[in-house]
Amino acid sequence: MKNGAVIIPAAGSGTRMKLDYPKQYHAVAGTPIIVHTIRAFNKHPCIAKIILVVPQDHLEESKALLQKYQLENISIVTGGARRQDSVLRGLQEVPESIDIVLVHDGARPMVSAELISRCYKGAQQYGAVIAAVPVKDTLKRGAGRIVTGTVDREGLWQAQTPQAARKALLVKAFKENGMRNVTDESTLLEGVGIPVTLIEGSETNIKITRPEDLILAENFLREKKEPMQKIRIGHGFDAHQLVEKRRLILGGVEIPYHLGLAGHSDADVLVHALCDALLGAIGAGDIGRHFPDSSDAFKDIYSIRLLESVMQKVGELNYKIGNADISVICQAPKLAPYLKQMQEIIATSCACQISDINIKATTTEKMGYTGRGEGISCHAVVLLQQ
């Protein structure tokens, strides 16, 4: 189950890039740098919340950018004088329910889903981690232009982001060490005695700082956009009988009706069909294999919990939902007033945007068992992207 948030500080200037606007708004491969960065986290199965920290005078521009690129469920706050002030403002927006907080530079658009996962899982295991790569080049110490010594690179690492920690540890670090000027969160954590574990970063996960960095980013992101994504498609179907003395739950929503669906769980045909579609897409059988009706553990369970479990399996294979199309076949009751609420619940459970989930209801014009009001059925088709 996703329990992570990411703070993306993007309140810097474009001075070293020789721009008259913040570098994160500069387009690379046809898309602003900050949009590339947000997209890397937006559908990641571990990330439940994104907090974007931007300059005060670019707040409205940032809001318009998110709307233009249909980036939903993102909180925007304005930054402070120092990076750590910006991160602290973002940290104050992290929900109480979140356990793991990642911090990632807005100008590192080439971060991979695999690196995000490594940092998230590393923080779960160790408490605090930092993405880094071993220093490969020979390092020289100098005074002016004169070499005064060679630095032993043994044990030296080049820090990157994401940097991740349990929220409580990060809050402690800011409370006890926040007045000190630092360049990253790891230094804050180290300063209060919290061990920070090195996580293998990536040579391509560069921070765009100088004009020449744009050449690498342009080539990398353009190549990344061009190949066809690995996709998988699944179809699911479920049907349950309508009976007395049962609640009617569809798409996680309780619907007022004198009949409910019979079943071992809450018999939510919509969620069950979607679970089967997801399991089918990843080649993992069906819902009965994973949640058998012979187990008391699933007796009367709210099926959204089953969906969250299935999505965890999907995420472990580094897949995410591209879109899902769901058709409920039901003569009565009328479902139209409840479809938006269903859509919101499903999107939240699947860690995707509301626009990625389409739910529609139809009838069989009083033909067959659904037409006679004996039951409700549902078809679901889902596309997964890696």
Curated annotation (Swiss-Prot):
Transmembrane segments: none annotated. The record marks 16, 23, 264, 363 as: Transition state stabilizer. Its EC number is 2.7.7.60, 4.6.1.12. It catalyses: 2-C-methyl-D-erythritol 4-phosphate + CTP + H(+) = 4-CDP-2-C-methyl-D-erythritol + diphosphate; 4-CDP-2-C-methyl-D-erythritol 2-phosphate = 2-C-methyl-D-erythritol 2,4-cyclic diphosphate + CMP. Residues 1-231 are annotated as: 2-C-methyl-D-erythritol 4-phosphate cytidylyltransferase. It comes from the Bacteria. A divalent metal cation binds at residues 238, 240, 272. GO terms for molecular function: 2-C-methyl-D-erythritol 2,4-cyclodiphosphate synthase activity; 2-C-methyl-D-erythritol 4-phosphate cytidylyltransferase activity; metal ion binding. Residues 232-386 are annotated as: 2-C-methyl-D-erythritol 2,4-cyclodiphosphate synthase. Its cofactor is a divalent metal cation. PROSITE patterns: ISPD (PS01295), ISPF (PS01350). The keyword Metal-binding applies. Pathway: Isoprenoid biosynthesis; isopentenyl diphosphate biosynthesis via DXP pathway; isopentenyl diphosphate from 1-deoxy-D-xylulose 5-phosphate: step 2/6; Isoprenoid biosynthesis; isopentenyl diphosphate biosynthesis via DXP pathway; isopentenyl diphosphate from 1-deoxy-D-xylulose 5-phosphate: step 4/6. 4-CDP-2-C-methyl-D-erythritol 2-phosphate binds at residues 238-240, 264-265, 286-288, 362-365, 369, 372. InterPro entries: IspD, IspD/F, IspD/TarI, IspD/TarI_cytidylyltransf_bact, ISPD_synthase_CS, MECDP_synthase, MECDP_synthase_CS, MECDP_synthase_sf. Keywords: Isoprene biosynthesis, Lyase, Metal-binding, Multifunctional enzyme, Nucleotidyltransferase, Transferase. The record marks 153, 207 as: Positions MEP for the nucleophilic attack. GO terms for biological process: isopentenyl diphosphate biosynthetic process, methylerythritol 4-phosphate pathway; terpenoid biosynthetic process. Pfam families: IspD, YgbB. NCBIfam families: ispD, ispF. Bifunctional enzyme that catalyzes the formation of 4-diphosphocytidyl-2-C-methyl-D-erythritol from CTP and 2-C-methyl-D-erythritol 4-phosphate (MEP) (IspD), and catalyzes the conversion of 4-diphosphocytidyl-2-C-methyl-D-erythritol 2-phosphate (CDP-ME2P) to 2-C-methyl-D-erythritol 2,4-cyclodiphosphate (ME-CPP) with a corresponding release of cytidine 5-monophosphate (CMP) (IspF). In the N-terminal section; belongs to the IspD/TarI cytidylyltransferase family. IspD subfamily. This is Bifunctional enzyme IspD/IspF. It comes from Desulfotalea psychrophila (strain LSv54 / DSM 12343). The lineage of its organism: Bacteria, Pseudomonadati, Thermodesulfobacteriota, Desulfobulbia, Desulfobulbales. The gene is ispDF.
